[in-house]
Structure formats: C-alpha cells, structure tokens
Design a protein with these regions (language model features):
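Exported/periplasmic cell-wall-interacting domains
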Residues: 2, 134-276
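N-terminal Sec signal peptide cleavage junction
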Residues: 19-22
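Glycine-rich catalytic cores of cysteine/serine-nucleophile enzymes that process amide/ester linkages
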Residues: 102-110, 115-141
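Short, flexible beta-strand-to-coil junctions
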Residues: 96-102, 114, 188, 232-235
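Bacterial N-terminal signal peptides that target proteins for export
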Residues: 1-8
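N-terminal post-signal-peptidase region of extra-cytosolic proteins
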Residues: 73-98, 103-106, 133-139
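N-terminal low-complexity, Pro/Thr/Ser-rich intrinsically disordered segments
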Residues: 29-73
C-alpha cells in the first residue's frame, strides 16, 4: 500500500514544478498576474448600431478633438471583442490615431465603465514607419515599424526600457506578431515635448507605442491585464483587411465615413478614406 504522506509530497512537488519557469525574455520580471491560457473565442456577433452610436456620442463628449471616424472604428472593434469573449465588458479602451503627427497628443485612454477620459498623451511610432507622420506599417520582425489594429493588453515586466506592458495583437496579418516582435508599451526619454521644439517631432521607437517617462507607469497600470488598445491610421490595406472590426459586415471605410458625416451634421465627411 502506498504511503499517503509520500503521495501528498509528490503531488505538491509536481504542482510547484508546473508553476516555475523563466520569463518570456531574459531581462523580464513578470507581474504577479500572468496572462490567461488562450481559449477558442466564440463567434463574434454584430453589435447593435444603437449601442455603438450611444457609445460614440459618449466618447465624442469626452474627447471632442478626436476623429469621430477613428473612435467609431475602435468602438466597433471593441464590440466585436466583447461579443467573442476576448475581454470583459468593463475593459478600458485606449485609442491611438497614427494618422496624426507625433507632435500631436494622439493617444486617448477611456474608462467607459465610469464614463471618463483618463489620459490624452503623446505616443511615439516606430522608426520604420516614417518621420513625424507614420506612413508605413508592418507585422514583420526587424521592420522597426508600428503595427495597426486591436491589441489586448497582457502582463507587465521590467526590461531594457523599464516598466513595460506586453501586447497581444488580435488582427491576424497586421499585429498578431506583436508579442514575438516584443512590441510593448513603455516609457522613453525621446517622447518629450522639448524634442518637438528642437527637432520638429518626437523621437521614434523600434515599433513600440512609447510614452513620456513621467506618465508611463500610471498609464500602463491602468491598461494592464486584458484591456484594449486600438491603433489606427488611414492605411488602405489595413482598412480593407483588418478583422477586429469586421463582425458587423460593414466595411471600415463605411464605418469611418458615416461617423465623420454624422459628426459634421450631415455635411461632407473627411475624404481621407473613400467609402465604398
């Protein structure tokens, strides 16, 4: 007959061995909350248009300077992620509009559950994407370019760029290599308004959405662990092929153009994207 105490000791040893393991990168110190094991998402169901419209009105009130078309597409992607179980209903939403120059504060962080704008901030793009305005985007390692689409935030760690936030891309072909590329949110000395005055733009990252060092920890702590980040640009390939916002069956160009048109009171929408 087996000794019960010996069996208990073996079971505990097995359990502890399963919990041990190195961080994803050698210099990483992972936060206590580890990312959940991936599960097959349920099929996304198109969100009711009235729900998106009401949420868009709230975001426009909180961020009147943001492009309503960008906010609408971000909300569409958020609704699709909610319907497929990718995130919880109270997940915060960060929106980056890379169609704006780096000299603009083009990052907004929303807490929709409490109807608040938490931050509007500067954010750098990758050196492979352009100078002051990002014009090229990539999902390829070594490109040093920014990726577009919907990201779900994950764990924090401390590495070469200090306190950082890992991102998992939810747009296949556009940002789903973010983790393997080490595309993370972090603070950086080159995200500094003084550089705008001296060189006409912010410094650039190797593809990461880098923030001012003074605010990076606060923003990261508010976005860590299964919140959402939507990165937008007027990029035709992304707007045609992105999947994160496609569950309603409406094209991205139509979503963006309709929101801009509604915000302008029915007048001509901004023509950066031609609706089909």
């Amino acid at each position: 007959m087996c000794d019960p105490n010996r069996l208990l000791t073996l079971a505990l040893a097995t359990l502890l061995a399963g919990c041990a393991g190195p961080a994803t990168r050698p210099d990483a110190h992972v936060s206590v909350a580890e990312p959940a094991l991936p599960t097959a998402p349920a099929p996304a169901v198109a969100p009711p248009a009235a729900v998106i419209g009401a949420e868009l009105a709230r975001l426009q009130r909180l961020a009147p300077d943001a492009d309503p078309g960008v906010l609408a597409l971000a909300l569409e992607a958020r609704a699709c992620a909610l319907s497929s179980g990718e995130v919880d209903p109270d997940a915060r939403l960060a929106v980056i509009d890379y169609s704006r120059p780096s000299t603009d504060k083009r990052l907004w962080v929303f807490d929709l559950a409490h109807d608040r704008l938490l931050h509007r901030e500067y954010v750098a793009h990758g050196s492979g994407s352009g100078e002051n305005i990002a014009r090229r985007f990539s999902n390829v390692d070594g490109s040093h370019a920014t990726s577009l689409g919907l990201f779900r935030t994950a764990e924090t760690y401390v590495g070469g760029n200090g306190y950082s936030l890992r991102l998992d891309g939810l747009d296949p072909g556009f940002n789903d290599h973010a983790r393997s590329r080490a595309i993370v949110m972090h603070g950086a000395w080159y995200v500094n308004p003084d550089l705008i005055r001296s060189q006409g733009r912010l410094g650039r990252s190797q593809g990461c959405p880098a923030l001012r060092q003074e605010v990076a920890k606060v923003v990261i702590d508010e976005l860590k662990q299964r919140q959402l980040l939507f990165a937008y640009a007027d990029d035709a390939q992304f707007l045609r092929g992105g999947r994160s916002f496609a569950c309603s069956g409406r094209s991205a160009a139509r979503i963006v153009a309709d929101a801009r048109d509604a915000a302008s009171g029915g007048g001509l929408a901004r023509t950066a994207i031609a609706a089909p």
